[in-house]
A protein has these predicted regions:
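Conserved Lys-Pro-Asp/Glu-containing loop-to-beta segment of HAD-superfamily phosphomonoesterases
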Residues: 120-146
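Basic, amphipathic juxtamembrane/active-site segments
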Residues: 35-54
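Asp-based phosphoryl-transfer active-site loop
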Residues: 17-34, 68
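Glycine/Thr-rich beta-alpha phosphate-binding loop at enzyme active sites
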Residues: 107-127
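Conserved hydrophobic residues forming the short capping helix/wall of the S-adenosyl-L-methionine
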Residues: 90-95, 136, 140
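Substrate-recognition element of Asp-dependent hydrolases with the DxDx(T/V) motif
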Residues: 50, 54-90, 100-113
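Short, solvent-exposed loop/turn segments at secondary-structure boundaries
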Residues: 42-43, 76-81, 119
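Non-catalytic pre-domain segments flanking phosphatase-related domains
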Residues: 1-25
Length: 146
């Protein structure tokens, strides 16, 4: 029996089996210059070659996902809302160059955090893997992947 191949929204579907590639990227030091606890747009600077590299990944069928530790929240240097504003701006800047980030996942926790709400030894802080599994689960639903 032949299983029809078809392309749907950048994924290849073979019957009910779907394949997708995901590139998991860190933010600070990978996407932007790491200047310690960046949360202001004025402090954010894309690294040279990053935009063209992201384009190449995207053109080769990768969903682009950022996974980043943001302990500045736990330290009280900035708030989660500040990160969200920065990420929204970053998405808009990348979109101008034809680059789409599927989603950003971040860990605001730290075992010895200044802000009690964020003081925990969590499983989402890299190099632990909770955020990666969360991303895969959410993206499977979002892109209807099996």
């Amino acid at each position: 029996m032949d299983i029809p191949n078809k392309v749907i929204k950048g994924k290849i579907a073979l019957g009910k089996i779907c394949f997708h590639k995901i590139a998991f990227l860190d933010r600070d030091g990978t996407i932007n210059k790491d200047k310690n606890y960046i949360y202001k747009i004025d402090d954010f600077e894309f690294l040279p070659g990053v935009i063209s590299g992201l384009k190449k990944l995207q053109q080769n069928g990768f969903l682009l996902v950022i996974v980043t530790n943001q302990s500045g929240v736990a330290r009280g240097y900035y708030k989660e809302e500040d990160i969200e504003v920065l990420h929204k701006w970053m998405f808009q800047e990348l979109e101008k160059s034809g680059v789409s980030i599927a989603k950003v996942y971040y860990c605001p926790h730290l075992p010895d955090a200044t802000i009690e709400k964020y003081r925990k030894n969590c499983n989402c802080r890299k190099p632990k893997t909770e955020l990666y599994y969360k991303a895969i689960s959410e993206l499977k639903r979002l892109y209807d992947l099996d």
